[in-house]
A protein has these predicted regions:
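Active-site neighborhood of HAD-like aspartate-dependent phosphohydrolases
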Residues: 1-53
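C-terminal cap/substrate-recognition subdomain and adjoining C-terminal extension
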Residues: 2-5, 77, 84, 88-220
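Aromatic side chains
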Residues: 10, 25, 83, 179-180
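Short linear elements at protein peripheries
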Residues: 22-23, 48-102, 106-108
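General structural signal for secondary-structure boundaries
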Residues: 31-36, 55, 70-76, 154-157
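Short N-terminal helix-initiation segments at or just after the protein's N-terminus
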Residues: 42-57, 75, 122-125, 137-139
Length: 220
């Protein structure tokens, strides 16, 4: 019988990167005139709802008319540009890259689990050399974006479900797996793994980590 091994699972925004990856990507879409600049007026509202845990299905279950018919290749190229901009502005934590490289050197399986879009995260995943991405996905057909998500976004409980599904399908041992995140929103997933690790935690996660005796890392 094949021995089950653990995995090292990482959140992305504010854990590996200093920025919100989807926001910097949105700014490029505005620059390319795919989205109107007026969409920016909704960003503070969305960010506040996310920060305080008030995000609901209605915030995710929406249609992006501006993206309907946009070429997947264009969106992929824009994701590469977004990543290159992040590297130029040093938006990827050097400590995170070194930490992941160390884990890879010990033959650990590395997984990114994020509510951000897979299209946006793919260049970062390639740079880090990870084994898998679990993320929110845009729906495409015949190489064109349908302007909606494929399934539910990988946020909070749904993120937990998607990770557990991947874990089961790939014969990974949860008890010897680690999960790294900055956000209390990932509490459901923290409670599933054997080794929860708070990275650059917000005040609620800091309090939670201290209560449970979880390690706290500071990536810079």
């Amino acid at each position: 019988m094949e021995e089950k091994l653990g995995a090292e699972i990482f959140d992305v925004d504010h854990t590996i990167t200093k920025n919100i990856t989807s926001l910097s990507y949105l700014l490029l879409l505005i620059k390319r005139r795919v989205f109107s600049i007026t969409i920016l007026r909704h960003i503070p509202y969305i960010c506040m709802n996310y920060k305080y845990g008030h995000m609901a299905d209605k915030h995710f279950d929406r249609h992006f008319d501006e993206l309907v018919g946009v070429d997947k290749a264009f969106m992929d190229d824009l994701a590469v540009e977004n990543f290159n901009n992040m590297m130029k502005k040093e938006k990827v934590y050097g400590d995170a890259k070194r930490y992941i490289d160390h884990l890879k050197g010990n033959n650990k399986k590395i997984i990114l689990a994020t509510s951000s879009m897979e299209t946006i995260i793919k260049p970062l995943a390639d740079y880090l050399g990870v084994d898998a991405i679990i993320a929110t996905k845009f729906a495409f057909k015949d190489g064109k974006c349908l302007g909606r998500f494929e399934g539910k976004p990988a946020f909070r409980e749904e993120k937990r479900k998607k990770v557990l599904e991947y874990i089961k399908e790939n014969n990974i041992d949860l008890a010897s797996s680690s999960f790294y995140s900055d956000s209390i929103h990932d509490y459901p997933l923290f409670m599933e793994v054997g080794n929860p690790v708070a990275v650059n935690p917000d005040f609620r996660l800091t309090r939670c980590a201290k209560k449970h005796g979880w390690p706290i890392l500071k990536f810079r």
